[in-house]
Amino acid sequence: MQATADRALERAWEVLEAVPDPEIPVVSIRELGILREVRRAEDGHLEVVITPTYSGCPAMSQIAEDVGHALEAAALGPYRIATTLTPAWTTDWITDEAREKLRAYGIAPPTGNCGGGAGQAASEQPIAFIPKLPAPACPHCGSKHTERLAQFGSTACKALYRCIDCREPFDYFKPY
């Protein structure tokens, strides 16, 4: 029985690995760090834990719906989707593979490190002012000669930048 349950959890992770972020479809919710945990609850239900990139993220209902559809399509039995806000999501949770996919898609990945490693409780994170980070490199030509045009880009978690060298605009995934 335990081996079957473990295989179901493995299968759930595999299935959910393919669920794309609805706002940036080239990366999965797992690669972005939104998919936090998949576990078996005491009542036998599969429990999927997700964390929004910020507390007001409008894509969370779509993400939950997509997770549900993926689990149903894989016939993984009864499930529950839980949203947790603690610890708060951080761009540190974005995988290296996702950063490369973002760059190839034309979105500059976040620069620097926010210091909130996966699983670190919010109370364990030092409180500090956000340092001025270097300008992001252009995802089109690689130049570091970029300028911010607007604090918000195509979504609230991105800023709009332009490359001074190739003149192309691009979104920058803000670090937080």
Tell me what each language-model feature is.
Residues 1-176:
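Domain-level signature for proteins that mediate thiol-based redox and metal-cofactor handling
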